[in-house]
């Protein structure tokens, strides 16, 4: 093969592989709530849990309430009695190179606390 064919094949391979690499690094954040706590889960789009990240919990006015390290299984639990959740919560997960967030509304908390 001549150099042009080799370069064309290499470029085609790069164009095919590049979107897969970018997709593998998307950060997915989910939070569920019950009457006692918010459970935060963070993983990459390939399903691997985030193993190192800071989880910031902010109130409805965007004031920082607490920062917690994520567990190696990609989760962290925030006890509701440790934060002012009257106006909802903004949960931010930051791995250092990727970040994303989840909003927990007052209605989410109230709905899950009904007996």
Describe every region a protein language model picked out.
Residues 70-80:
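Glycine-centered loop-to-beta-strand initiation motif
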Residues 46-51, 84:
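A short beta-turn/strand-edge loop motif at beta-sheet boundaries
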Residues 17-19:
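N-terminal signal peptide c-region/cleavage motif recognized by signal peptidases
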Residues 53-57:
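Hydrophobic beta-strand segments
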Residues 1-10:
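Bacterial N-terminal signal peptides that target proteins for export
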Residues 21-39, 43, 61-62, 68, ...:
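Beta-strand-rich domain onsets/edges
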Residues 10-12, 22:
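Cleavable N-terminal signal peptides
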